[in-house]
């Protein structure tokens, strides 16, 4: 157990590894499902306030979705959280109820002692009851201190869940199988590495104006398109939004038969999580059919090759929530590299 001194003590407790996955039940539901459990009836308002603060709206074109689908459970129903991909338990030190009895079984003596003394803190437990699962425990010496801890750390806990979800998604992709032949082709022909699940197929590649390739998964339609433009000044191009939009627009017309909707654009610094770059999010409309949807585009500069890459995530799923699809594709995008990982 390792204690990290940030705003509060954060302890990470390891769960089962890949070798054990065949013998352990996989947690049901989606990576956006979150159970919040309070250990004492008096903590109900604390749990509900935290659920509001840890969540946030995501806008896809004109429809707004919440990042997480949250269910809140009282102490007598704590065991329902065992079926969720993500769970946050909120409790106070010295509580001897059923929730704390279960939590004590899941933690080392060191972790438990840390939470039961002083100012409390946060604990992560990976795969507590099933594989591909994350449990976060928040403990305070009393209700007010717990509420303050959760308020200060809501964004941090959100980030912990999303970061671990990406790790779990990639872990599950590897377990289910990767399209190694297609991955090798991407490396040998185009010079980039990407962990491609077997469920994605190569839909098309190669255009004179915009070189690249499109990976597709159906039911509903989801695509990861990677294109690039050679330039003598990759860093300069990365700072030129007009050129970045032109690259994405040309790719959209050639690969997707679509137009972009400029008034929908939102920009942010950073590429896929863990990568430097620039992100553009917006909407597209079809040129050959009446429909459209959201896209996320990441632009990355490769100074060694003199190239700017665009990694584009797109879905067409009318009437369906989009966040789960983008969460899965974003995890894949984080594996992009121009340096092939060594086995």
Region spans (language model):
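C-terminal motif of bacterial Sec signal peptides marking the signal peptidase cleavage site
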Residues: 12-15
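Surface-exposed amphipathic alpha-helical segments
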Residues: 145-173, 194, 200, 307-343
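Short, well-ordered beta-strand elements
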Residues: 133-145, 224-229, 307-316
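Signature of long, low-cysteine stretches enriched in small and polar/charged residues
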Residues: 77-86, 90-138, 250-306, 320-321
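Sec-dependent signal peptide recognition
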Residues: 1-7
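Loop-centered beta-sheet repeat module
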Residues: 171-217
């Amino acid at each position: 157990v390792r204690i990290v001194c940030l705003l509060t003590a954060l302890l990470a407790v390891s769960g089962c590894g890949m070798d054990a996955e065949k013998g352990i039940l996989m947690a049901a539901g989606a990576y956006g499902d979150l159970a919040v459990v309070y250990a004492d009836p008096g903590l109900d308002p604390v749990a509900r306030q935290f659920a509001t603060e840890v969540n946030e709206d995501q806008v896809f074109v004109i429809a707004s979705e919440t990042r997480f689908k949250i269910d809140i459970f009282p102490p007598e129903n704590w065991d329902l959280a065992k079926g969720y991909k993500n769970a946050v338990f909120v409790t106070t030190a010295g509580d001897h109820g059923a929730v704390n009895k279960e939590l004590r079984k899941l933690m080392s003596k060191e972790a438990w002692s840390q939470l039961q003394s002083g100012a409390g803190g946060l604990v992560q437990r990976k795969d507590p009851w099933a594989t591909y699962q994350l449990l976060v425990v928040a403990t305070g010496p009393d209700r007010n201190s717990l509420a303050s801890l959760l308020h200060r750390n809501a964004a941090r806990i959100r980030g912990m869940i999303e970061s671990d979800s990406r790790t779990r998604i990639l872990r599950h992709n590897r377990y289910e199988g990767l399209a190694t032949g297609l991955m090798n082709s991407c490396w040998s022909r185009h010079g980039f590495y990407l962990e491609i699940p077997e469920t994605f197929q190569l839909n098309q590649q190669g255009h004179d104006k915009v070189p690249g390739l499109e990976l597709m998964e159906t039911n509903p339609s989801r695509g990861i398109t990677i294109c690039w433009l050679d330039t003598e000044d990759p860093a300069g191009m990365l700072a030129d939004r007009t050129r970045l939009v032109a690259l994405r627009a040309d790719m959209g017309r050639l690969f997707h038969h679509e137009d972009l909707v400029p008034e929908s654009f939102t920009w942010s610094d950073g590429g896929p999580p863990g990568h430097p770059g620039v992100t553009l999010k917006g909407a597209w409309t079809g040129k050959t059919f009446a429909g459209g949807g959201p896209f996320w585009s990441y632009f990355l500069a490769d100074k060694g090759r003199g190239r700017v890459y665009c990694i584009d995530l797109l879905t067409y799923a009318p009437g369906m929530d989009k966040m789960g699809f983008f969460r899965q594709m974003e995890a894949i995008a984080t594996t992009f590299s121009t340096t092939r990982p060594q086995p």
